[in-house]
Amino acid sequence: MSIRSGSAATLVHTVTRQDIEDFARVSEDHHPNHVDDEYMGRTSYGRVIAHGILLMGFMSAASSRMLLDAADDTPGTVVSYGYDRVRFVAPVFVGDEVTVDYEVVELDADTGKGRSNVTVKNQVGDTVAVATHLI
């Protein structure tokens, strides 16, 4: 793999009601925060919010995009060892366009292990989630 410090990818996705409903179905997380308009209408959020873990799925997709973009004929497999310091700092609503910026910030040439910074922002530039990805 031609992955090095500075390797990066960006993913842009508009969150739909169908995304949230599909994620609720697959994950079996049907908490009212994510699926009940009436319930959330009575809260300070005013409407349903996307699952934080759905945002992590977008983080993973950005990681995969970076890996595919950086791939060459060199043998080797980069895998995810998990995410540290994950924070969901603002809600994401139906119709929000999220941009995931993923960048490798450290990579050990001998072991191939490293870490990446991941930031998710909404369409107005507010940070909605952050994480450190261990690869």
Predicted features along the sequence, with ranges:
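Catalytic strand-loop segment that frames the active site of acyl-thioester-processing enzymes
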Residues: 1-50, 68
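HotDog/MaoC-like acyl-thioester-processing domains
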Residues: 1-8, 88-135
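Hydrophobic beta-strand-centered segment that forms part of the acyl-chain substrate-binding groove
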Residues: 47, 60-101
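Hydrophobic small-molecule pocket/channel-lining residues, especially in calycin-type beta-barrels
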Residues: 12, 40, 78, 119, ...
